[in-house]
């Protein structure tokens, strides 16, 4: 018979009711080769995300703000563009928005485009280590500015007692407010 080492109790939702709540969902995208196994895993992932969000909304309150990286539009136009960026995630966002949430733009278009361009450049091999190092430093600096901008936009729009949903890559480096 195994011995129980300890028990971690789930905290009640009560203390969080009047605080800002941000649910973070790592974005997973369709595999490039449309492999059946990969698609099945992806479907299961998004189904579990929907289930967890529904459960958390019942305890913590309705999601009022939806934030998605790489998205530069709000409303119906934002949802349509999201279908191109993240087809699986867009279905979730559509349901949440139909229940009253708003899509909030968190990206600065110039910083987003700069980071995407630099990322493409860094995929190429370089003859000069100096050029590679300079581009890497530029890219990291741009990412730092981009993530700081995302953090400030969330901080501006998510008010006390509200819940928001952030869909972002799992390797993000956004630093959130301490509350």
Label each region the model flagged.
Residues 1-179:
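Compositional signal for N-terminal targeting/processing segments
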């Amino acid at each position: 018979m195994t011995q129980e080492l300890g028990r971690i109790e789930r905290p009640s939702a009560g203390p969080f009711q009047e605080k800002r709540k941000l649910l973070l969902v790592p974005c997973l995208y369709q595999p490039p080769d449309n492999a059946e196994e990969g698609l099945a895993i992806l479907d299961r992932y998004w189904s579990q995300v929907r289930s967890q969000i529904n459960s958390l909304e019942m305890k913590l309150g309705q999601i009022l703000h939806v934030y998605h990286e790489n998205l530069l539009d709000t409303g119906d136009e934002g949802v349509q563009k999201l279908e191109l960026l993240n087809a699986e995630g867009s279905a979730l966002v559509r349901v949440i928005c139909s229940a009253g949430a708003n899509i909030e733009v968190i990206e600065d278009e110039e910083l987003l485009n700069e980071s995407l361009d630099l990322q493409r450049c860094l995929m190429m091999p370089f003859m000069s280590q100096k050029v590679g190092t300079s581009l890497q430093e530029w890219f990291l600096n741009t990412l730092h500015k981009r993530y700081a901008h995302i953090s400030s936009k969330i901080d501006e729009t998510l008010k006390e007692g509200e819940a928001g949903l952030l869909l972002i890559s799992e390797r993000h480096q956004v630093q959130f407010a301490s509350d």
